Regions:
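Acidic active-site catalytic centers that drive phospho-/nucleotidyl reactions
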Residues: 31-33, 98, 123, 174
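An acidic intrinsically disordered interaction segment
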Residues: 1-12, 110-119, 140-144
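Hydrophobic helix-and-loop "lid/oligomerization" segment in the mid-to-C-terminal part
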Residues: 3-28, 34-76, 85-93, 168, ...
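A generic local secondary-structure boundary/capping motif
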Residues: 83-85, 108-111, 135-137, 157-158, ...
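Active-site cofactor/cluster-binding pocket
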Residues: 74-134
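Short alpha-helices
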Residues: 122-193
Length: 345
């Protein structure tokens, strides 16, 4: 069942009612949309069954201020654990929000959930694989959080203020604070308007202040590394971050940054696109690449991510792959860039 919002919503309600425990997941290196959409979805679950057990599993810990806000709202629902080692004893319904498959939550690409766990998906990315039996995929939406809003509204569930705020965080994060091109831009504005009508303009600006203010020094030290490692070409630019870079910059191994290297450099010069390569914190042979278009619809980056085994949006995409060192990782990306676009680094 796909892309029929009323049918999907009703079937999801039925599945939750018949489940013992709901398992949600944050994808690797969770961004604001991953966090906001999953926390916002708790509003839906609590309206269906306020007593059902619910866990949110994340291999990577969110940034400190976000993590504390989640703990304050949800108690112990968020558990920092690798999904492949988590004990799915009572968990019989897994809901993937903002990613298409369980492999996006762990570094083990062969990991699968136990067979008795049913799955459902709420996503705004283009699928490279067959989606689960129950799914709502809407690629015109710029964020998964906006889909969570739609599902709550379809069910006529009133959004609690705290959950509504996490939904707005997800929307703002994936839209670049409403700066990215969005086919449903007016709808995004209407969701914000709804929040302001219910809770006041000042509370909306408090969300902005929370997301933009009081960044720790380590965040700026990471940005300095990305800028120091910047390489600019006529058609594109790229940067990188290794674990040694982090250590030399005085950034702890456990620090969870919010800066995306590609987003940081996306407006440089006459670049058509940019990318960043980062080393995994736990697996030194695993690297992640993030692509960002600098020209909107006039230059799409998703094909490069797909070529490297990933996916995403036309204008923002990513992948992860193995390499012996950062130079090899960058060269693999540059080779892909050349094969698909004719550019050489």
């Amino acid at each position: 069942m796909a892309n029929n919002l009323p049918e999907f919503t009703q079937e999801l309600i039925n599945q939750i009612k018949n489940s013992k425990q709901i398992i949600l997941f944050l994808h690797l290196s969770p961004d604001l949309d991953s966090i906001g959409s999953n926390i916002g979805f708790l509003n839906f679950i609590e309206n269906v069954n306020p007593t059902i057990k619910t866990k949110i599993i994340s291999k990577d810990e969110p940034s400190e201020n976000i993590y504390l806000k989640i703990k304050e709202l949800t108690g112990n629902k968020l558990e920092i654990a690798d999904p492949q080692s988590y004990k799915y004893e009572e968990g019989d319904l897994a809901i993937f929000i903002d990613f298409p498959e369980i492999q996006r939550t762990t570094t083990n690409k062969d990991f699968k959930l136990p067979e008795y766990v049913k799955t459902a998906t709420i996503d705004h990315h283009v699928f490279e694989t067959e989606p689960p039996f129950l799914n709502y995929i809407e690629t015109k939406n710029l964020s998964a959080a906006s889909l969570v809003y739609e599902i709550n509204r379809q069910a006529n569930f009133v959004l609690k203020k705290d959950y509504f705020e996490f939904i707005l965080m997800g929307m703002l994060g994936d839209s670049g604070f409403l700066k990215h091109r969005d086919q449903k831009f007016v709808q995004s504005l209407s969701i914000i308007q709804k929040y302001c009508e219910e809770f006041g303009n000042e509370n909306y600006f408090k969300i902005i202040d929370f997301l933009e203010s009081h960044k720790p020094l380590e965040e700026y030290n990471l940005q300095k590394v990305y800028l120091n490692n910047l390489v600019y070409k006529n058609n594109f630019a790229y940067t990188s971050m290794t674990n040694n870079d982090r250590k030399n910059a005085g950034v702890s191994h456990t620090f969870s940054e919010t800066t995306n290297g590609a987003s940081l450099i996306r407006n440089i010069g006459e670049s058509k696109f940019v990318f960043s390569v980062t080393q995994d914190l736990d697996d030194e042979n695993l690297y992640r690449v993030s692509f960002r278009s600098c020209l909107g619809e006039n230059f799409q980056v998703r094909d490069m991510a797909v070529k490297l085994g990933g996916g995403g949006h036309l204008l923002a995409a990513g992948a992860q792959f193995e390499a012996s060192n950062v130079e090899s990782a960058i060269n693999l990306v540059l080779q892909t860039v050349h094969e698909l676009n004719g550019f050489w680094g």
